[in-house]
Amino acid sequence: MARAMSFDRIVVVDWSAHSTPKVGADSIWLAVDDRRSLVVENPATRADASHRLTSIVEAAVDSTTLIGVDFSLGYPIGTARALGCTGRPWHAVWTLLADSIVDDERNRNNRFEVAAASNASIGDGPGPFWGCPPSRRVEHCLSSTKPERTAGHPPEWRHVESVLRRNGRRPFSSWQLLGAGAVGSQSLLGIPVLERLRRRFPQRVDVWPFTTGLGLPPLRPGQVVVAEIWPTLVTGTDTTGPVRDARQVADVATWLRGLDRGGELRGLFEPDVAAARRSAVIDEEGWVLGVSGVDGPARNMTVR
C-alpha cells in the first residue's frame, strides 16, 4: 500500500575516489538515521561501502529509505549522444560505466582509462574529461590540466550547476577528475555501485528524478529513493568534530530528518525547473536535492 511522504531511514553518503583503502579525512563516510538514532560510519573501501548499502536495502523490505549521495548522477545534455549511447540517456551512461569501470576490493580502479576511452569516443584530442596524475595521462585522450573545449564536447555544466553558479555557488564540473573538491572521479566510481543496486533490486530502487520525474509519488513499503545532494548547501551547528566529512553527512541527515518530520521534505523533490529544461533534467542531467530551479538553493538549509 502506498504511503504519504515519510522516510523510515535516511542515509547520507560522502563518496571517495581514493585508489587505496582509507579512513578518516577525505574518505567514505555514511550517516544512517533510522528515526531512533543517527550512526556515522567510515568504511575503508568502496567495496565495503557498497556491501553496506546493499545490506541496508536488503533489510528495508517493509520500510522506506532515502539515500543521498554527494556526486553527480548525470552528465550535461548531449553526453550520451556524444558517447554513441542509445536509449534513455541517463541509463545508457550508467550502463556504460557499470560495464566499463573495474574497481577492486582494495580500491584499485581504471577510472582514468575509462575517461580516456570516453574522450576518444567523443572526439579527437583530450576532453571533456580531464585531470589525472602525470603517470596516468593518455596522449591525445586525457590530460592532467584542463584542455580547450571544442565544438564536439558536451557542455561543461549541467543546468543545476549553472543555477548554482548564478547564485554565487562554486560547484565543480563532472568532467574534472582530480583536484581539491573535484567530484568527477567520484561519479565515475559511484554510479556503477548505484547501477548494481538497481539491478539487484529492480522493483524497489528509484533514482530521482530519472525514474520518478521531478516529484515523488506516495512511497511504497520497501521503496528506496536515491538522490543527489550537495553537502555544502547545509549549514551545520557542530563545528568541533575532528573530521569535516563526518560532520557534514551527519548534518545533512539531521537536516533531511527535520524536514521529513515537519512535512516539508516533499518540496525538495519538486524544484521549479523551467518547462524547456525539464526533459533534459529528467532524461539525462539529474538535479540536486534542495536546489530551486529558478532562485537557486532552498532558503532554509540550516540544521535544526
Predicted segments — roles?
Residues 2-9, 15-66, 71-304:
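RNase H-like (RuvC/DEDD) metal-dependent nuclease/polynucleotide-processing core
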